[in-house]
Amino acid sequence: MSNNSSAETEAPETTGGDGPLLDLTDAGVKKFIKQAKARGYVTMDELNKVLPSEEVSPDAIEDTLAMLSEMGVNVVEAEEDAENAEGGEVATRDENTTVIASDKPAAYDRTDDPVRMYLREMGSVELLSREGEIAIAKRIEAGRDTMIRGLCESALTFEAIMVWREELGTGRILLREVIDLEGTYAAINGVAAQPAAEDDEGPAEPVDDEAGEAKAEGAEGEDEDDFDDGAGPTVSAMEGELREGVMAILDAIASEFEAFRKLQDKLVGSRLKGEDLSDADRKAYEGLSATIIQHLKTLKLNNNRIEALVEQLYAINKRLIGLEGRLLRLADSYGISRGEFLKAYFGSELNPTWSEQVKAMGVRWTKFVENDSQSVTDIRSEIAALATETGVPIDDYRRIVQTVQKGEREARQAKKEMVEANLRLVISIAKKYTNRGLQFLDLIQEGNIGLMKAVDKFEYRRGYKFSTYATWWIRQAITRSIADQARTIRIPVHMIETINKIVRTSRQMLHEIGREPTPEELAEKLAMPLEKVRKVLKIAKEPISLETPIGDEEDSHLGDFIEDKNAILPIDAAIQSNLRETTTRVLASLTPREERVLRMRFGIGMNTDHTLEEVGQQFSVTRERIRQIEAKALRKLKHPSRSRKLRSFLDS
């Protein structure tokens, strides 16, 4: 009994519809919590059995997970996950410690609710400590350094850098397109630079952990444009300050690369002759390589540029694999196994006497190099051309590709772990922006995009926690997506900011004067042209569907009550129909010739009216005769017996 009471006292109160879903007064739930605390974990299947069967909100599920976390209970996907987390110790349970399953539907064991499934997967990942964040950040940095170290051994990298140097000098590209401005600024100046004060460069850098977390918690009532631009230098200011130093580094790389390229060409030429570099040249080669790598680490290339270099490296590697595959298939046609071929081929890619050497390995090899000598020669010539293009021997190039792939793989895995460990942060921020035009899952996805960008930008040496820094990127991604996607008719971000400014001012003036301010008062308060205020207020109105139900019965729609300016009113249609019938009867009282002339002259019952000349041609008479017939017919119509039938239409 004491244990049950302690479980109740340690667990937070759950009152209200938005609290955790566990009823702490239920005996089954009490026993469930007691056993979960004793084990230190609970599986998602066990948790689903004690959750209520009715529809639950994502907020309530998140609060329940948070409550269990505060009680020291980890939520894992399955028993195996808990055993692995405890270092392989098997968690034993006997019949007495088995969780009593409640009489809830078994549907919760297998759910198709995407939010619940997402939260279930998210709950299986443990949160990171400050030390864990630093360890992962170091792994990301190490993976990136490994990639750069591999790229620096390829002449293609430096040829691309020389092109960038020339384009920077002529002004065809900007410095921000080549390097990571913030990282290079910090490396050259020896201080942690604040994020650049520009929309696309990133949100503001938090002052400290507590302040950042407090702002994150208070983000619920904020508008889409409430980002602090920070006090860091602008992008233009950074470029102006860094340009001279960056160009000096690029000049140094250019001068060192000239000597390095000569050594690379010498190395490839030696391998083509079956020789190798001398000890002095090898030492100079390694020294220049280390110096250039250090220069590039100081520059901190833009991620897009690194990706372009990696793609270039992989493209050549794909060509190399294709050539080697063709050579392997030729050898296979002569009964040479893959293992035999690779053993004889690796290390001798550029050996000019390779064909003669493999003849000594047997009859199959002799037939292979003699019968397909032209194909073998052509393929090996193309492979040698690739070595000349890359500036390194093929075996070294293959090692470079493996080094870059290893660094990329390690960095990607570390980033994945950092992202998965902070998915709860995205949930906590995204739920503050619900009911703003985007569904909850869409908000989560946009927040995850911001989280991934924060992982790329995070600098652990600055001293603050990752969650504090990532909050700003997540909020920015969510609010930008709301501005871009929430409205049926997209409004630009700068106009969204103007709308928010007017809405805030209108709300403030409502408290001051006790009524909604007029456009004139808003224009005066904001020092903004009246016409612009009117246009913004018009744009700010949300569109409404014509299919919106009207009334309690919902049997009519808004579109039923909107006037169609182009439609003919029923009364007008009736008048027109009656006028047509009356006119026909009145004209029928004339002679057929007079009726025909009037109908043609005034276009009654026809597409258009006709001139006297046209009517005369129809009756084979002169214009004057037609005019006389028309005048006589009109005099007859003026007689009261006929005119009174038409006069009522004239009055109406």
Curated annotation (Swiss-Prot):
Subunit structure: Interacts transiently with the RNA polymerase catalytic core.
Any one GO MF annotation of this record: DNA binding
Family matches, as HAMAP family: Sigma70_RpoD_SigA
A Pfam match: Sigma70_r3
Region (Disordered): 1-24, 194-236
UniProt short sequence motif Interaction with polymerase core subunit RpoC, positions renumbered to this chain: 442-445
Protein species of origin: Caulobacter vibrioides (strain ATCC 19089 / CIP 103742 / CB 15)
CDD domains on file: Sigma70_r4
Region (Sigma-70 factor domain-2): 418-488
Record key words, sorted: Cytoplasm, DNA-binding, Sigma factor, Transcription, Transcription regulation
Start-end of DNA-binding region: 612-631
Protein name in the entry: RNA polymerase sigma factor RpoD
Keyword Amino-acid biosynthesis: no
Location of region: Sigma-70 factor domain-3: 497-573
GO biological process, one term: DNA-templated transcription initiation
Positions of the UniProt region annotated as Sigma-70 factor domain-4: 586-639
UniProt subcellular location: Cytoplasm
Major localisation: cytoplasm
Skewed-composition ranges (Acidic residues): 197-211, 219-229
GO CC list: cytoplasm
Function: Sigma factors are initiation factors that promote the attachment of RNA polymerase to specific initiation sites and are then released. This sigma factor is the primary sigma factor during exponential growth.
Family: Belongs to the sigma-70 factor family. RpoD/SigA subfamily.
